[in-house]
Amino acid sequence: MDSVRLEALFTKPYGQSAPTETQLRDLYDEQVFFQDPTQERQGIEAYVAAQDGLMKRCDDIYLKPGFIAINENIAFVEWEMGLKIKGIEFIYPGVSRLEINSEGKVINHRDYFDFIGPTFGPVPILGGFVRWLYKRFVD
């Protein structure tokens, strides 16, 4: 796994298709463990189902890579993801930590991002409450 393959994996402009199951199986180990702030999935079938589920819940999705760092079998990819849902666009900046096995496939994939702020911030009434909570506990 090199930076060119990682950049391709983390690139999906609005209006273009997501990676196919075949493409994901070429990059991910059968026993891949995936975790993000909303879910944990074990195995390639569960990972593919999670990706398909996200695509079905959204009108469109984009993914844009930023900085990519690889050290031996660990890679970090900064990214920005946009989700369009019912006419509202949600933007999530984040980073992925990928562990690569000896066959060059991802065996562990963990995404780090703030789910609450970008999800509920744009929503009337809830957005104000979320911003109040952040100020109360973060500032």
Residue ranges and their predicted role:
Residues 12-13, 38-40, 83:
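Short histidine/acidic/glycine/proline-rich micro-motifs that form metal-
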Residues 14-17, 32, 36, 87:
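Flexible interhelical turns and helix-capping residues at alpha-helix boundaries
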